[in-house]
Structure formats: C-alpha cells, structure tokens
C-alpha cells in the first residue's frame, strides 16, 4: 500500500485560506505542505520569522502554492490580532484556524520553575485561546459561516501523564475549550474539532528526548 497517496482529491482545498500556528517546522510544516498540495493558501506563524521565511520559500517551490510567513507570539492577544489583519489584507478571508503551536518539558514536575510551567500553559492554552477568540470574534461579527477551528491536542489530554504535566494540563484545557465551543458556536456555523496525533518523530520531540550527545 502506498501511504504517500493523498486521501483527498486534487484541489480539495482550492480557494480556502488556512492559518497554521507553529507552522515553521515539524507537524505544522508537514500539515502546511499537505494543505498547499490540496490548493489552499496558508499563513504560517511562529516567533521565528527567519525559520518561517525559509519554510515558506521551500514549500512554495515544492508545491507551487502560496504560503505567507508572519511572526506572531500567540501568547499575546495584540500580536494575534495583528497577525489576523495581515492575513485578511493578503487573502481577504480565513476559513480555517489550526492551533498547533506548542511547547513541552520532559521533567519531574518538582524540578520545574513556576515560570517554566507558565511558559507551556501560555503557549498551548493561552495561545490557543487567543487565536480561537480572535478568529471567532471576527467570523461572528462578519456573519461568516462554514468556518473551522482545529486544535492539536495529545492522548494524555484524556489520560494524564507523568513528567509532562504542564503540557498535559494545557492540552486538557484546550480539549475542554474545544468541546465547549463546539456547542456554543455551532449556531454561528463554526466547527470546533480536536485531534490527538500521538507520538511521532520530529526534531522538537527528539531534541527533548535526546538533549545531548550519546
């Protein structure tokens, strides 16, 4: 079986505009690649504009699509609002928000500082909240329907897990927000979904598991 074959037809996402937070590398980059291959226009965000620009250039050459890099720290609502305005100026609309920006520490919890714990909560939970709220307010105020928010969570958002407590806490919050807004915003034509891909090899994951040379 050829697992490289697309599940969706060519141009399935033609004329769609998607925002991918944490889109410069890893899972975000992989999802952005697929969206571009399916015909979507994609805005990718993170704090590292150089990485974003390199990724956007690479993916546009690879797919022939349009990828817009925007520096944005999702922990700050004003930056999220600015990012949204830049996307609207470039593409005129947004159809999908993909909350993928994340962080994690693999560590006994008692060894973490309060600031380290807060950092993960702020990126994952507060960042997802900021982006969801900004896009939701925009769509609702404009009366735009058939919109989607897709949140990336983890399997331990349901089960909990030792040594990743800040991430587990934040992802459980994102899951609760997703379920709650799925009910509240359904009347506005906004779909809320969350997926938990499970573990897979990315540079970010390997750097945390193998932080030094063996």
Question: What function would you assign to each model-found segment?
Answer:
Residues 17, 22-26:
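Conserved glycine-rich cofactor-binding loop
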Residues 49-50, 71-83, 114:
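The beta1-alpha1 cofactor-binding region of Rossmann-like NAD(H)/NADP(H)-dependent oxidoreductases
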Residues 55-57, 187, 199-214:
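A glycine/serine/threonine-rich, flexible loop-to-helix segment
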Residues 108-109, 113-121, 205-206, 214:
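Substrate-binding pocket helix/loop in short-chain dehydrogenase/reductase
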Residues 112, 160-168, 180, 205-208:
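Active-site loop-to-helix junction immediately N-terminal to the catalytic Tyr of the SDR YXXXK motif
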Residues 132, 170, 178:
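Active-site helix of classical SDR
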Residues 137, 141, 183-187:
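Alpha-helical segment proximal to the catalytic Tyr-Lys
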């Amino acid at each position: 079986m050829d697992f490289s074959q697309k599940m969706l037809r060519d141009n399935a996402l033609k004329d769609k505009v998607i925002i991918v937070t944490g889109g410069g590398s890893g899972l975000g980059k992989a999802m952005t690649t697929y969206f571009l291959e399916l015909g979507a226009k994609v805005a990718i965000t993170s704090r590292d504009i150089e990485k974003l620009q390199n990724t956007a250039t690479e993916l546009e050459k690879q797919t022939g699509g349009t990828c817009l890099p925007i520096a944005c720290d999702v922990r700050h609502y004003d930056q999220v609002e600015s990012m949204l305005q830049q996307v609207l100026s470039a593409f005129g609309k947004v159809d999908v928000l993909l909350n993928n920006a994340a962080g994690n520490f693999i560590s006994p919890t008692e060894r973490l500082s309060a600031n380290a714990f807060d950092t993960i909560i702020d990126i994952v939970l507060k960042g997802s909240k900021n982006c969801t709220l900004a896009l939701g307010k925009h769509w609702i105020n404009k009366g735009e329907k058939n919109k989607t928010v897709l949140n990336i969570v983890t399997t331990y958002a349901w089960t909990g897990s030792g040594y990743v407590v800040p991430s587990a806490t934040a992802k459980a919050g994102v899951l609760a927000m997703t379920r709650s807004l799925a009910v509240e915003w359904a009347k506005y034509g906004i779909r809320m979904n969350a997926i938990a891909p499970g573990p897979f090899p990315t540079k970010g994951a390997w750097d945390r598991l193998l932080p030094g040379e063996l």
